[in-house]
Swiss-Prot record:
Residues holding [4Fe-4S] cluster: 60-61, 125, 156
Protein name: NAD(P)H-quinone oxidoreductase subunit K
Topology relative to the membrane: Peripheral membrane protein
One BP term from GO: photosynthesis, light reaction
Family that this chain belongs to: Belongs to the complex I 20 kDa subunit family.
Keyword Plastid: no
Complex and partners: NDH-1 can be composed of about 15 different subunits; different subcomplexes with different compositions have been identified which probably have different functions.
Co-factor requirement: [4Fe-4S] cluster
Cofactor notes: Binds 1 [4Fe-4S] cluster.
Subcellular location: Cellular thylakoid membrane
Disordered as annotated region, ranges: 213-244
Keyword annotations: 4Fe-4S, Iron, Iron-sulfur, Membrane, Metal-binding, NAD, NADP, Plastoquinone, Quinone, Thylakoid, Translocase, Transport
EC number per UniProt: 7.1.1.-
Length: 244
């Protein structure tokens, strides 16, 4: 009897006796059942969809960012949830003028943020000092002298649409990062420092120009003798008239 059964029948009989429930059926379209990705892509996708900003507003630029909270722009659709604690935030948005007294507080907030963290410099006063960079002794000429900046957003002030564009560009940067490369590029210094090669240069200014006469003094010295001679001639003529 066993010799009359085909190999296929024997296989089916064995499956029925060994596994009465039957083997699970796998569909031919594997793309609907299997997701293939890398750890970097999965990690970046989770982070770019939930950027929690810490809002550091010191001047008028922050008013434009406050407009994003309303229903007209609704920045919640990007996953932005404002936080009041730096330990719960991964994005620092600096908007407004940064003074010398506020610089240590800003650096402390940045240090308390967990890795990975990002910084957006919003407005001209934050990037370069703005109108206070000319004659102010208390304004910081650029927040990148204190903390590393990932994205610069110029404007005085920037519009809410420009802030959305900056967030989208930052999301693209987050999506292309690697965990290993991010660990290599972590900041090791308290402040953002740059190595400079100082060369000794002697000044060409010897101070001789202070002893030189100006062009006005030279011209006045040339004109004075003529005036004196004309006055002498007038005096001699008047004396002659009196004698006559």
């Amino acid at each position: 009897m066993n010799n009359s059964l085909s190999p296929k029948a024997i296989r089916e009989l064995r499956e029925e006796t060994c596994n009465p429930l039957g083997a699970p059926q796998v569909t031919t379209d594997l793309s609907e059942n299997i997701i293939m990705t890398s750890l970097d892509d999965l990690h970046n996708w989770a982070r770019l969809s939930s950027l929690w900003p810490l809002l550091y507003g010191t001047a008028c630029c922050f008013i434009e960012f406050a407009a994003l909270i309303g229903s007209r722009f609704d920045f919640d659709r990007f996953g932005l949830v404002p936080r009041s604690s730096p330990r719960q935030a991964d994005l620092l948005i600096v908007a407004g003028t940064v003074t010398m007294k506020m610089a240590p507080a800003l650096v402390r907030l940045y240090e308390q943020m967990p890795e990975p963290k990002y910084v957006i410099a919003m407005g001209a006063c934050t990037i370069t000092g703005g109108m206070f960079s000319a004659d102010s002794t208390t304004a910081v000429r650029g927040v990148d002298k204190l903390i590393p900046v990932d994205l610069y957003l110029p404007g005085c002030p920037p519009r809410p649409e420009a802030i959305f564009d900056a967030v989208i560009k930052l999301r693209k940067k987050v999506a292309n990062e690697s965990i290993l490369e991010r660990n290599k590029s972590e900041q090791t210094h308290r402040y953002l420092t740059v190595d400079h090669e100082m060369n000794l240069v002697f000044s060409e200014n010897t101070g001789e120009y202070l002893n030189k006469k100006s062009e006005k003094s030279i011209e006045s010295s040339k004109l004075n003798p003529v005036e004196e001679s004309s006055e002498n001639i007038y005096e001699t003529n008047s004396i002659d008239e009196v004698i006559k």
